[in-house]
Amino acid sequence: MTERVVLAYSGGLDTSVAIGWIGAETGADVVALAVDVGQGGEDLEAIRQRALTCGAVESIVVDAREEFAESFVAPAIKSNALYMDRYPLISSLSRPVIVRHLVAAAREHGADAIAHGCTGKGNDQVRFEVGVAALAPGLSVLAPVRDSGMTRDKAIAFAEERGLPIDVSKKSPYSIDQNLWGRTAECGVLEDPWAQPPEDVFVYSADPTVARIPDEVTISFIDGVPVGLDGRSLPLADLVAELNVRAGAHGVGRIDLIEDRLVGIKSREIYECPAAITLLTAHRDLEDLTLERDVARFKRGIDQRWGEIVYDGLWYSPLKSALDAFVDSASAGVSGEVRIRLVGGVAQVVGRRSPASLYDHALATYDAGDQFDQRDARGFIELWGLPTKVWAAREQRLNP
């Protein structure tokens, strides 16, 4: 019988309801664990106290902002991680760090199970449970919201009946998840894919249609990782936080996506990720300047697969580790600066430079000083086109 459970606690509706459900259904003590991944908003001490009010025997808050940035966001930047070519894995990246701390807390507090507040329709249930299986296969997992069949309306009623201090109602039923890397919103009117998202859904970004004076930022990279902004060296967490404000002020990073979930359904998601889109745009441009052509071409496929397996909850997998090794090798030398203009919802690259640049002005220029010997082109074309020429001659011979 489960005697102690560590619950991944967010302070929201589902996990607050989960505390009461676990106690009622299993009789186990609940240790609530809230992991700070830069979500901001409500004070974490208030969240800690809420867990105790909802019935947890212990409530813990872990500051994982730097860890999240350095160990999870940085690899995503190096991998140009965009699921379906658009979504920068906001929630997908935070779940593995939460899992890491859940497992550590379970060991510290003698728990034999962990729990999460995910529904059966989402991706996070997979990310939590597969992550726990990879790090601590002996731990069992409880999913009270999913396994009790509790709908959102029922969860709201459960919270209201027991006087749980949750700020949610049937009139404003958005489900929000946010962290340093961005913000997600779903449910409510957003479930109609034809409905335009109300402006009050957006928090990280201003209306991009409102004219503003453009801003310009210069982002410094070393080996594919952002290390500075406008000539100032910054820890990655601080750099991302500042860019969220500056790029968000110009409406950068709003994404309205019909998303293919891992569980097989399509969902409508609203994302805000000003810093993520700005940094990924800058990083990809710097790669164009510094990576050899064949490496760059091959890496695009690696990047896509990297994003897919992270989205699918396989952060702690052998394939992910193997892909990381390639990305780390390819990223050596992706160093330099990228200048970005922020205006009208767009992060536009307007300049880039690198000590490892493969751009050779003397070869690229059409002006005086051109060192490219155009006479070499004739022989190159002859050899490059030779297989096609031989094939065409055969076709004419066989099909006159």
From Swiss-Prot:
EC number: 6.3.4.5
NCBIfam families attached to this UniProt entry: argG, PRK00509.1
Protein name as catalogued: Argininosuccinate synthase
GO terms for MF: argininosuccinate synthase activity; ATP binding
Binding site for L-citrulline: 87, 92, 123, 127, 175, 259, 271
Residues where ATP binds: 8-16, 117
Catalytic activity: L-citrulline + L-aspartate + ATP = 2-(N(omega)-L-arginino)succinate + AMP + diphosphate + H(+)
Any one Gene Ontology cellular component term annotated for this protein: cytoplasm
Organism: Frankia casuarinae (strain DSM 45818 / CECT 9043 / HFP020203 / CcI3)
Sequence similarity: Belongs to the argininosuccinate synthase family. Type 1 subfamily.
Alphabetical UniProt keywords: Amino-acid biosynthesis, Arginine biosynthesis, ATP-binding, Cytoplasm, Ligase, Nucleotide-binding
Domain of life of the organism encoding this protein: Bacteria
